[in-house]
Amino acid sequence: MLVLGIETTCDETAAAVVERLPDGSARILSNIVRSQTEEHAPYGGVVPEIAARAHVELLDGLIARAMTESGVGFRQLSGVAAAAGPGLIGGVIVGLTTAKAIALVHGTPLTAVNHLEAHALTPRLTSRLEFPYCLFLASGGHTQIVAVLGVGNYVRLGTTVDDAMGEAFDKVAKMLGLPYPGGPEVERAAASGDATRFNFPRPMLGRPDANFSLSGLKTAVRNEAARIDPLEPRDISDLCAGFQAAVLEATADRLGVGLRLFEERFGRPRALVAAGGVAANQAIRASLEGVAAKARTSLIIPPPALCTDNGAMIAWAGAERLAAGLTDSLETPPRARWLLDANAQAPAGFANTRAGF
């Protein structure tokens, strides 16, 4: 089974061809990613209109490269998959419309992939992992703990009630004057900092649910930074180290609860899996080893290039859905919001927050 995957939900334009073999294993035949960092850097964050226009300019060329590198012709494709959401709607429209055109012209089945499902299934692209497993999804737009029970079968066990983890890293970087994209810059600065200098809060620690909150921690960093004038490089490193240490401790606690909830409902997970751009953070990757060991399960984290947004994960999710007999109509709409767990409810008291979607 050969599938072309297209990713345009945020600020990466990507296309890939993945082969799903009869035994369920995979081969990545091509995986082309073009980051839009240069386009958005002057603004300190992603500008949706600029992102959408860049996708329009870049996508056709990237698809051509992905097809050429894979050695596969359009008529050989078993399916074409595109991220149909959630994401910045302009970019989602570009990718999904392009996939529909390819499907229509070549008579190829279309799969409209939930971007979060693609992250959830990526470990099966790299590790031959069987269901069920526990997913920690941490990116610029989402922070969730999810029970992955099968293709199309997901139960959300915990979510952020305010900032996503990647968003918090980026905002801390911006308030400290670090370059965009901020997450890797915070990680880099934290490596040489003193994590004990500032006593930052550990949000949601000890709660019986598995939800996250990072807004208060972000504010605490801002308040400490405001007390220091001038803000020297050493101060920035210490602030980043303290912030990251607080995130690590809170994450370990939240995941501990999430894994317990998983086991109570579904039995012991086959693995703890981390995905999303934040999973590329080396300190977080190291911290999760201890979390998995405490829960007596293994830890699986895809290579960093497959944690961040890419076309291979979309192609693989499309292949998984095709193998399960799932295809989509050419009338399938793009979605800015799209729950991975369609039955997920916002935590009590947080119905009007991002936890509701």
UniProtKB/Swiss-Prot annotation:
InterPro entries xrefs: ATPase_NBD, Gcp-like_dom, KAE1/TsaD, TsaD
Signal peptide annotation: none
Keyword terms: Acyltransferase, Cytoplasm, Iron, Metal-binding, Transferase, tRNA processing
EC number: 2.3.1.234
This protein's record includes keyword Lyase: no
Gene3D superfamilies per UniProt: 3.30.420.40
Binding annotation for Fe cation: 115, 119, 309
Reaction catalysed by this enzyme: L-threonylcarbamoyladenylate + adenosine(37) in tRNA = N(6)-L-threonylcarbamoyladenosine(37) in tRNA + AMP + H(+)
Keyword Ribosomal protein part of the UniProt annotation: no
Cofactor: Fe(2+)
Example GO BP: tRNA threonylcarbamoyladenosine modification
MF annotations from Gene Ontology: iron ion binding; N(6)-L-threonylcarbamoyladenine synthase activity
Subcellular location: Cytoplasm
Domain of life: Bacteria
Any single Gene Ontology cellular-component annotation: cytoplasm
Pfam families registered for this protein in UniProt: TsaD
Binding site for substrate: 137-141, 170, 183, 281
Cofactor note: Binds 1 Fe(2+) ion per subunit.
SUPFAM superfamilies referenced in this protein's UniProt entry, alphabetically: Actin-like ATPase domain
Membership in a protein family: Belongs to the KAE1 / TsaD family.
HAMAP family, per database record: TsaD
Described function: Required for the formation of a threonylcarbamoyl group on adenosine at position 37 (t(6)A37) in tRNAs that read codons beginning with adenine. Is involved in the transfer of the threonylcarbamoyl moiety of threonylcarbamoyl-AMP (TC-AMP) to the N6 group of A37, together with TsaE and TsaB. TsaD likely plays a direct catalytic role in this reaction.
Protein name: tRNA N6-adenosine threonylcarbamoyltransferase
Organism of derivation: Nitrobacter winogradskyi (strain ATCC 25391 / DSM 10237 / CIP 104748 / NCIMB 11846 / Nb-255)
Protein's gene: tsaD
